From Swiss-Prot:
Record field: catalytic activity: a (3S)-3-hydroxyacyl-CoA = a (2E)-enoyl-CoA + H2O; a 4-saturated-(3S)-3-hydroxyacyl-CoA = a (3E)-enoyl-CoA + H2O; a (3S)-3-hydroxyacyl-CoA + NAD(+) = a 3-oxoacyl-CoA + NADH + H(+); (3S)-3-hydroxybutanoyl-CoA = (3R)-3-hydroxybutanoyl-CoA
Primary gene name: fadJ
Keyword match NAD: yes
Site (Important for catalytic activity): E118, E140
Role according to the record: Catalyzes the formation of a hydroxyacyl-CoA by addition of water on enoyl-CoA. Also exhibits 3-hydroxyacyl-CoA epimerase and 3-hydroxyacyl-CoA dehydrogenase activities.
HAMAP family xrefs: FadJ
Protein name per its UniProtKB record: Fatty acid oxidation complex subunit alpha
Pfam families with a match to the protein in the record: 3HCDH, 3HCDH_N, ECH_1
GO cellular component: cytoplasm
One annotated GO molecular function: NAD+ binding
Family: In the N-terminal section; belongs to the enoyl-CoA hydratase/isomerase family. In the central section; belongs to the 3-hydroxyacyl-CoA dehydrogenase family.
GO biological process, one term: fatty acid beta-oxidation
Organism: Escherichia coli (strain ATCC 8739 / DSM 1576 / NBRC 3972 / NCIMB 8545 / WDCM 00012 / Crooks)
Subcellular location: Cytoplasm
Length: 714
């Protein structure tokens, strides 16, 4: 049976050809290798029709132009040569589009990313809609790749090398007005007139190319270029710590094209694409992409979710304010905040105002849209307006009696169907639900701080939580723009449980004499966004260490913190960034002063600050404990799958994405190697490093957690 075409040609009465992109049975348009023959057949027809005045590419999808190439194509390549051939095929197709003797215009609405933008770049002009859904970018670097269909060569010539490098090296996505300002698109119009605007551009013959800004012209010359690539290379190396080979290859390929011409540039691009596709970093990053896509499709349970029309929040603090913001402004749901203090409500409202006003200032949002979103948030000091809320999120202090009281009050003041979701980070959900009259509607919904930035939420049903409550809470989390994982109601849940031994070990090394900055730098070099000591300062030392006794009580000695260290720090009124002093000292709010390690920390904890461990040794001790605990979590069914475990670690605590998560990383080392390292560390440093039974068994059998493909679980 012949495959339905993703590209359809229609010629209007005014002799302008419209090529409509509509991948059958898919929500998103993605480019597949098999579409090449369809496009070539259309190009042949275009060349044969001598009456044609021009061509417009447009999507039939309601909210995307082309979201990129189908990543499965890369996974199907077994060698670098196969992946290189794939890139060359894409380059050739784009070259054929660009070589058409009549004007070719891309009419862009929605996501125009990766291969989609490369197709648009191959056109002679581009017009896009002013819709917030319209974004343009080359995000391949986030998959450990580079643009392989000419993007590294066409973009620098269109918008200038420094701007193009920023886009390609970061995967940054531009909104319509930014794209217009940079010259990436020729016009921005309302969606209703997109096609006609593109047709008008065709009738102007070829759009006149605007000259590059003076700065970009200087940087394109040999001297400016040498200086630019040296500076950008240095900055990129500092940012990536040498862990992402794609960034180095991007710089190399773009420079080759500018110095030696496009032919050499395309050749270097295809070759680098093929080689990068085979790197373990790209394979790991693609596995994270597939896993997160999979998690987003997971309903959490087999039951249908209940309707969600409005939400209530208890507590207007930092977490409550952040949760209100994502509920109103991302999920689009009316939110009512209850706080015993009017100042708490004002704080929560100001939090959302600050976020939205920042978007208005950056011209990402209209003032009228800001006001519309803010109008969804209201506050009260009692339960007025709570009677018909479908779900209440509790974000009050970590106190069991207080949370149980909140459950009782919600059951008394809200509808019989109302779900109670606790944002606890450490208290068992079963205990919070212990006195509930409707325990099946009590669940944990654990956000991470700052709420608007952290993508993960943990959803924690207790033994009596209903399947519908789980499904409804998962539905809300997705509407809020979060990636939810469902975890078991055990102390620390998943993320805090694997994080605690990692932080504890860092503190232990401090007491042994390692310096704060050495420990943090070692873990940043390993691939974490910040080191464990700085992380504790950012979270708040009082908040971050509160869970340690809970975990020690539940799991024993392996979770114990070094004696008296935490209490000494807290007794010295050190809470971290929030009060200006922790392990580091912070300048006054609003002032741009670098944080500095406080030398007084060493005598305070009885340490010398004269370490002997190398950076890899420091990282090994912290990371191995995290891996061991993650495996225990699978064994105890705290997480439902290793997919959730990898996503939870990467999105929840910044586990290095290029390693693919704890379970991918164990597989890459081999269970046998992990066991050998842990046994060596146990001999040197104590029984907390004893590898768990599951790891030892896997080592004996030569087993791994994942199958070889990026998308399948074993």
């Amino acid at each position: 049976m012949e495959m339905a075409s993703a590209f359809t040609l229609n010629v209007r009465l005014d002799n302008i050809a419209i090529i409509t992109i509509d991948v059958p049975d898919e929500k998103m348009n993605t480019l597949k290798a098999e579409f090449a023959s369809q496009v070539r057949a259309i190009i042949k027809q275009l060349r044969e029709n001598k009456e044609l005045r021009g061509v417009v590419f447009i999507s039939a999808k309601p909210d995307n132009f082309i979201a990129g190439a189908d990543i499965n194509m890369i996974g199907n390549c077994k060698t670098a040569q196969e992946a290189e051939a794939l890139a060359r095929q894409g380059q050739q197709l784009m070259a054929e589009i660009h070589a058409l003797p009549i004007p070719v215009i891309a009419a862009i609405h929605g996501a125009c990313l990766g291969g989609g933008l490369e197709l648009a770049l191959a056109c002679h002009g581009r017009v896009c809609t002013d819709d917030p859904k319209t974004v343009l970018g080359l995000p391949e670097v986030q998959l450990g790749l580079l643009p392989g269909s000419g993007g590294t060569q066409r973009l620098p010539r269109l918008i200038g090398v420094s701007t193009a490098l920023e886009m390609i090296l970061t995967g940054k996505q531009l909104r319509a007005k930014q794209a217009l300002k940079l010259g990436l698109v020729d016009d921005v119009v309302p969606h209703s007139i997109l096609l006609e605007a593109a047709v008008e551009l065709v009738k102007q013959d070829r759009p006149s190319s605007r000259p590059l800004p003076v700065r970009e012209r200087i940087l394109a010359g040999p001297l400016g270029r040498a200086l630019l690539f040296k500076m950008v290379g240095k900055k990129t190396e500092h940012k990536t710590q040498g862990n992402y080979p794609a960034t180095e290859r991007i710089l190399e390929v773009v420079e080759t094209g500018l110095a030696q011409g496009t032919s050499s540039g395309y050749d270097a691009e295809a070759r680098a694409f093929g080689e990068l596709a085979m790197t373990p970093q790209s394979q790991a990053l693609r596995s994270i992409f597939f896993a997160s896509t999979d998690v987003k499709k997971d309903p959490g349970s087999d039951a249908p979710p209940a309707p969600l029309n409005s939400v209530g929040i208890l507590g207007g603090g930092l977490m409550g304010g952040g949760i209100a913001y994502v509920t109103a402004c991302k999920a689009g749901l009316p939110v009512r905040i209850k706080d015993i203090n009017p100042q708490g409500i004002n704080h929560a409202l100001k939090y959302s105002w600050d976020q939205l006003e920042g978007k208005v200032r950056r011209r990402h949002l209209k003032a009228s849209e800001r006001d519309k979103q803010l109008a969804l948030i209201s506050g009260t000091t009692d339960y007025r307006g709570f009677a018909h809320r479908d779900l209440i999120i509790e974000a009050v202090f970590e106190n069991l009696e207080l949370k149980q009281q909140m459950v009782a009050e919600v059951e008394q003041n809200c509808a019989a169907h109302t779900i109670f979701a606790s944002n606890t980070s450490s208290l068992p959900i079963g205990d919070i639900a212990a006195h509930a009259t409707r325990p099946e509607q009590v669940i944990g919904l654990h956000f991470f701080s700052p709420v608007e930035k952290m993508p993960l939420v943990e959803i924690i049903p207790h033994a009596g939580t209903s399947a519908q409550t789980i499904a409804t809470t998962v539905k809300l989390a997705k509407k809020q723009g979060k990636t939810p994982i469902v975890v078991r109601d055990k102390a620390g849940f998943y993320v805090n449980r694997i994080l605690a031994p990692y932080i504890n070990e860092a503190i232990r090394m401090l007491t042994e004499g390692e310096r704060v900055e050495h420990i943090d730098a070692a873990l940043v070099k390993f691939g974490f966004p910040v080191g464990p000591i700085q992380l504790l300062d950012e979270v708040g030392i009082d908040t971050g260490t509160k869970i340690i006794p809970v975990l020690e009580a539940a799991y024993g000695e392996r979770f114990s913190a070094p004696a008296n260290v935490v209490s000494s720090i807290l007794n010295d009124d050190r809470k971290g960034r929030k009060n200006g002093r922790g392990f580091y000292l912070y300048g006054q709010k609003g002032r741009k002063s670098k944080k500095q390690v406080d030398p007084a920390i060493y005598p305070l904890i009885g340490a010398q600050g004269q370490g002997r461990l190398s950076a890899p040794q420091v990282a090994e001790r912290c990371v191995m404990l995290m891996l061991n605990e993650a495996v225990r979590c699978v064994d105890e069914q705290v997480i439902r799958s290793v997919r959730d475990g990898d996503i939870g670690a990467v999105f929840g605590i910044g586990f290095p994405p290029f390693l693919g998560g704890p379970f991918r990383y164990i597989d890459s080392l081999g269970a046998g190697e992990v066991v050998a390292i842990m046994q060596r560390l146990a001999t040197q440093y104590g029984s907390r490093f004893t590898p768990c039974e599951r790891l030892v068994e896997m080592s004996k059998r030569g087993e791994s957690f994942w199958k070889t493909t990026a998308t399948d679980l074993q």
